[in-house]
Amino acid sequence: MLDEALLPDGSFHPDWEPWSQVSQEEGSETIHTWEKVVRRLEREMGLTHFQDSTATSLNSPWSVDSVPWILGSDDWALIEKGLEQRVRLMKAIQQDLEGACRLLSERVLPPEIVFLHRGYLPQLHGLEPSPTLNAFDLARGPDGKMWVISHRHDITSGLGFALKNRSILSRALSTPFQRCRVRRLADFFRSWRDTLESCSSRTPRNCRVVFLSSEQRRVKAEDFFLANYLGYTLALPGDLTVRDRQVWLRSLGGLQRVDVLWRTVIGRDLDPLEIAPQPCDEWGLPALFSAIRANQVQVVNPPGSGVLESPAFVPFYRAICQKLLEEDLLLPSAATWWCGEPKALDHVLSNLSTLVIKSAVSRWDNRRQYGAKLSAGELSTLRQQILADPAAYVGQEEVHLSTTPSYRGGALHPAPSGLRTFAHSDLFGNVHVMPGGLGSVISSDGERERECTKDVWVRAEGPLPPHHSLWPSASDESAKTTTSF
């Protein structure tokens, strides 16, 4: 495994040296002290999604590790450029699928990949371009480059936890944070807020943005944290109504018109009048799609963008990038085979015990299976499932994650780690990449479950510009003066 922090001779990577120097200067108990401060701040913020009511320490998948993931400016510049291209590519694909359909008519992309995916919503084709907020899961490949493992375009999660992690570690580790000259996150959120408020025909001052959450969303505290940080109203579908193809927010003062909905409700579940909900669904705003088609409300991300999450796109990205952007793909993806093609199907079935099998029709289907963990009987069952519906499956190379230092049991240990990054586009096609992200420490026992999260520090190449917090409330002076988002 590649080590993000240590060189082959055991010394720290130059990008990690300021963090290492501070830990040595302040004594052997420094990291343990940081750990105690991190746990205290985490309890005070109250955002951690614990798996049970008795969890009090680093045993929740959303707890933050007291050791950050540090990336140098040169390393990040390559990642940033690749992510910027990925966002442009995803927008170009969606515009093509909703317009000229060159990818399908010229057989660059097999039509089954699009039409079988549950995120494909032809009800909303022909709309004006909309801004998007995207997430990309990355892992360090054996060539030392970051590889893209998966995309998130329908709804994204983790942005609030990345913000929480930065709030905690910038305070608990204030000295190494300053020594490392860590790039701030506030400018990214500021540009995202400006983008949302520019979506309305009304002036930004009069534009009403509502953060649409869900009753069943597992980490709803994250939605509350983000809405509070950006100064938006957090609402559930039942708090809204559609009248005369306009969306309104119910309030004690009467109905208030909504211009922009930033959603964390799955696209297929947004409007039960147009797409029949599943029996367990409790969300949805009837007639929302009619308001969208009438250009009376902007919904971000646009419903229908979920189709872009299909891993079946991956084998065709290089050809698609050349066709639509006339560029070479900058960030590689994990090798992937769509079973809807006979040769790819043969390869997957011949290597079933070494591949990761995923659903090609919905990321919400619980079909991800690691062949290396399955028994002979389970592999046989999986083989029959794939043969029964090949187009619904992909096989993907299992990427062995690089390691970062993680504080466990009173000591530092190398832990497999993955990285989720975020980027957004505005109405003018400009792409903004968040200089940081949400790191995940993955269990090394073969279960590949998240053990905790990490703050991701991207080091600045030169002096940092003045920092201005985005906290909207003057009453939260402590957050304004002590956090370094």
Where are these regions (language model features)?
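Preference for protein termini
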Residues: 1-485
